[in-house]
Every structure is written in structure tokens, then in C-alpha cells.
Amino acid sequence: WFGARYSDRAGLGDWTVNPEKFPNGLEELIDRVHALGMDFGLWVEPESVNPDSDLYRAHPDWIHKLDGREPLTQRNQYLLDFGKPEVERFALDMLRGLLNTYAIRYLKWDMNRAMTDVCESLTPFARERHVLALYRILDALEKEFPDVDIEACSGGGARVDLGMAKRTAQFWVSDNTDPFDRLFIQEGYTLMYAPMMMSCWVTDTPADGRRRGRADWRYKFHAAMGGTPGVGA
């Protein structure tokens, strides 16, 4: 929905509506969603940026990197350094802008790469500064937009921890939506965390063909009832 995002190689970090995809803006889509009796949600990945983006071209110094070394890409993207006050301000202002402009009830906050280009000897406390800034942003959003639910996601369940549980409404615990596998994933999750915070989607994806055929829909829904169920593609 944003920037020049036609693949995972470009546009990440440019959080403005793509006019080719939405010539009438997001409002038309939001109105259609509301007409169907649903609230509107949006996917964002505020911590990452593509090298091929207006944001990175304007601020190449905003990413985590080690002096004298070429920064690493994962999934064709760098990681913004939230430990820099100007980056923290940018992310918070961007999210405030979206939530003040559009009738958004839900944000899926994704994070699709590991934190590389940091080490204690060369960038002391870089991880801590990043996470504390993330917490400040989430705390501010919760205070200013109490009716907006944020789901924490990170390549699956890499963001499941107590710090995020305090600040988000739900966790995306795994990209694996196979109902048989989910029974084990969900059991492990609920040993520590509340089932109501666990997103459990029913999808039309076949089960692992090496072991099982396509699962019965009733089975899929029964498995999803172990947490907060949803329906996805």
C-alpha cells in the first residue's frame, strides 16, 4: 500500500500511500471495509528500510552499521537505528500521522530481519537503546490512541516477550498456519503467555504434503480456537 512497494526490494520506509495502487487514497478501501461491518487494519514495518527507498537515500546514516564495514542486508533491507533520537522521532511521527489521518483500528507491527551490525565492543548498548526507544514509541501510541490494537510480529514469533506483552494487544506467534503444527506451537506459547494474545489464523493453505493431506476446515477452526481466531489468505 506504500511507496514504490512492488516487491520486497524497494519502498520500505516510505510510508505514504502508493497513488497507482490507491488512486483515491486509502479512504475508499477503509469505507468499503466499514461497509462490510469490519474495522480497518494496516501492516507496517517501522524498524526497517530498503536501500532502494527515499528514506534511505535521504538518511543513509540512520541505520545500524559498523564503521568501515558494508552494512548487511537481510530480506533486501537494513535495520533503522531507533537508538538515534531523530530516528525515534521519525517513526513516532510517521505512525501518529497514519493514525490521525485514517480510521485505523489495528496495526500489524512486523520486523522481518535480525539485528545485525551491532556488537558490544563497537556499538555498546546499541540493542538496549533500540529496544527502549521501541518501548517509548509503543507507550506513546497506547496513550494517544487507546482504541488502536497493535499486533507484534517478527518473522513469526520472534517478538514474543514480556516487554512486548505489556505494550501490544496480540502476538503473531508463527507463520506456520498448519493446524496440526499449530497445536504444538500454541501449547508451547500458552505455557508462558495468555491465549487471548495469540493470533490463530485459519488459512486455505495445504498441510505439509510430506506427511498429511489438506486439513478439514472444522479441524482448522477448532485448532484456531486455542487463541484469538482469524481468517487469512
Regions found by a protein language model. Give the residues of each.
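Aromatic-lined carbohydrate-binding/catalytic grooves of carbohydrate-active enzymes
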Residues: W1-D93, Y106
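Active-site beta-loop-alpha junctions enriched in small/polar residues
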Residues: W1-F2, E45-V49, N112-A114, C153-G157
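Active-site groove signature of glycoside hydrolases
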Residues: W1-F2, F90-L122
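Short glycine-enriched, charge-decorated loop/helix-capping segments at active-site entrances
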Residues: W15, T123-F125
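Alpha-helix-loop-beta-strand connector modules within alpha/beta enzyme cores
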Residues: N24-L36, E128-F145
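Generic structural signal for hydrophobic
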Residues: V33, L98-L99, L141, A224
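Hydrophobic faces of well-ordered beta-strands that scaffold small-molecule active sites
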Residues: F40-V44, L107-W109, E151-A152, V231
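Glycan-recognition surfaces
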Residues: N50-R89, D93, V131-G232
